[in-house]
Design a protein with these regions (language model features):
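RNA-interacting cores
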Residues: 1-218
C-alpha cells in the first residue's frame, strides 16, 4: 500500500539537514505511537529472515521547491513524499492516524497535511515500469586484509541482479513466511535517467555512515 502525502509548512518553509532520511524514519515511527508495542518491535527488532532484519516500509525522497546551503535544505512551500509498506498492521495504523490528525512535526518544523492519496496496486504480467522514489541500495561485505569492508553495487555490476533477488527473496520470506514463486531482473541497459545518490545516516557508534544508492527509471 502507498501513502502519497503533501504538507504545508506552518511557518513558510521547511528546514532540514541535507541528509534528512533518519528524520523521515523518525517521523514514521512517531506515526505508529498509538500502538507503542508495534512501534517498538519495528524499531528495535523488525521482521527477520536468515539473519537479516527488515523494517518493511520505505520513505521516498522529499519533493518540492528547495534551496541548498551549508549542508541544509530549505523547502520553500509545500513538500511531498510517499510511504509504502506491504504490512497490513502498519498500513492500518497510518490510515487511522492520517484520518484523525493533520498537524505533524518533521524535525523542528510543524507541518500541516494538505493532501493525502492512499492506494494499492496489483501488477499483472511479467514486465513493469518502475520509477524510483527512493534510492535502490545493494551492498555486499568483503574481507580486505582481515578487515570487513562494504561495497555498494552499481546497476552495471555483474552480481547486481543476483544480490537484488537475494534481498527480494529474504524480504518476501520475512514478510509472508514463504518463499516467492518468481524472480526479478533489471536490465541495466534499460535504466534511464540513472543517477548515483549518496547520503549520510547516523551509525550505531555515533559516526555517520555513507550510503550509496541509485535513482532512475527502468
Amino acid at each position: 500500500m502507498y501513502f502519497r502525502l503533501t504538507f504545508e509548512p506552518q511557518k513558510g518553509c521547511v528546514d532540514l539537514p541535507l541528509s534528512y532520511h533518519h528524520i523521515l524514519q523518525g517521523f514514521v515511527y512517531h506515526l505508529l505511537d498509538e500502538n507503542p508495542e508495534y512501534a517498538s518491535f519495528l524499531h528495535d527488532t523488525g521482521f527477520q529472515a536468515e539473519a537479516r532484519i527488515f523494517k518493511m516500509f520505505v520513505c521516498g525522497l522529499l519533493n518540492g521547491r528547495y534551496r541548498v546551503s551549508d549542508g541544509q535544505i530549505r523547502f520553500l512551500d509545500t513538500v511531498s513524499f510517499e510511504i509504502r509498506s506491504p504490512m497490513a498492521e502498519f498500513n492500518g495504523l497510518l490510515s487511522k492516524r492520517f484520518s484523525e490528525e493533520n498537524v505533524y512535526q518533521l524535525g523542528n518544523n510543524t507541518i500541516i497535511l494538505s493532501g493525502l492519496e492512499i492506494g494499492d496496486k496489483e501488477y499483472l504480467g511479467n514486465r513493469i515500469y518502475v520509477s524510483m522514489r527512493s534510492p535502490l541500495v545493494l551492498k555486499k561485505y568483503m574481507d580486505v586484509d582481515g578487515k570487513s569492508n562494504t561495497r555498494y553495487l552499481t546497476p552495471q555490476d555483474d552480481d547486481f541482479n543476483e544480490l537484488l533477488n537475494d534481498n527480494y527473496r529474504r524480504k518476501y520470506l520475512a514478510a509472508f513466511g514463504q518463499e516467492p514463486t518468481g524472480k526479478i531482473w533489471i536490465d541495466p541497459n534499460s535504466w534511464h535517467r540513472q543517477k548515483k545518490y549518496v547520503t549520510r545516516f547516523p551509525g550505531k557508534t555515533g559516526e555517520d555512515i555513507l550510503i550509496t544508492g541509485w535513482l532512475g527509471d527502468f
